[in-house]
Amino acid sequence: MDAGVAVKADVAVKMKRERPFKGIRMRKWGKWVAEIREPNKRSRLWLGSYSTPEAAARAYDTAVFYLRGPTATLNFPELLPCTSAEDMSAATIRKKATEVGAQVDAIGATVVQNNKRRRVFSQKRDFGGGLLELVDLNKLPDPENLDDDLVGK
């Protein structure tokens, strides 16, 4: 393989890791931010700061859809906004984009919390080198083994 091709491939992989989606970037402290340049202007629309790259990318997609229409290149084309791309002010576009990004962030945070709860629950059950025996609380006690259960077998 040519050395120049290898360097270009390494740069492409690094860029993909740093910017997995169009219109977003990662801050030094780990937050993902989204912004977009307004058409025919030098100014940028700030779309917010998010916990996940997906949330930032969805905010970007919403803004680019309303700015450039349905022919715009989107990160998630299968998730087009339900409304039509009418002419809106920059403030309205920013508001819609931040709402979408915040919703995606909230869903992501809920999933993370649920996964943490599952891990804590499974750690509590796994104790002493094996899983605890789960007891059916709806089952009536067996009178023959009642004395054994009280003594501890």
UniProtKB/Swiss-Prot annotation:
Gene3D superfamilies: AP2/ERF domain
Subcellular location: Nucleus
Pfam families in UniProt: AP2
SUPFAM superfamilies: DNA-binding domain
CDD domains: AP2
GO molecular function: DNA-binding transcription factor activity; transcription cis-regulatory region binding
GO biological process: defense response to bacterium; ethylene-activated signaling pathway; response to bacterium; response to cold
Residue ranges of the TM segments: none
Cellular component, GO annotation: nucleus
PANTHER family, alphabetized: ETHYLENE-RESPONSIVE TRANSCRIPTION FACTOR ERF011, ETHYLENE-RESPONSIVE TRANSCRIPTION FACTOR RAP2-1-RELATED
Name recorded for this polypeptide: Ethylene-responsive transcription factor ERF011
